[in-house]
Amino acid sequence: MNRQESAPRALFTPRQGQYLAFIHAYTLVNGRAPAHADIQRFFRLTPPTVHQMLLTLEKAGLISRQPGQPRSLVVLVEHGELPRLDPPDFNQSNSL
């Protein structure tokens, strides 16, 4: 078995899945993508943590966004592949 035939790799970590599910759900409910402040409030994260998380998701090809344009986040993962959005557990680390 060569590398291309190996077992499928998870598209994202459980934590990343929660961020993606939040962006997707927020967009459905509000008709627009969340602002960084919305993500900060929901997950109780600092601005630098949200920024780094979005960069990581973008590098992984899981979201797209237009730099300098607010609320331009688009989830590139099919809705059926996203996990259920759980309430954040503030007793655990919020890192990627």
Question: Predicted regions span which residues?
Answer:
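Short, cationic-aromatic polyanion-contact patches
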Residues: 10-16, 35, 66-90
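A short alpha-helical element within helix-turn-helix/winged-helix DNA-binding domains
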Residues: 33-43
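Short, hydrophobic-biased segments on the C-terminal half of alpha helices
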Residues: 54-55
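Glycine-centered, phosphate/nucleic-acid-interacting loop/turn motifs that mediate DNA/RNA or nucleotide
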Residues: 61
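Short, Lys/Arg-enriched N-terminal segment that forms or immediately precedes the first helix
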Residues: 1-11
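Short helix-capping/hinge SLiMs at alpha-helix to coil transitions
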Residues: 25-31
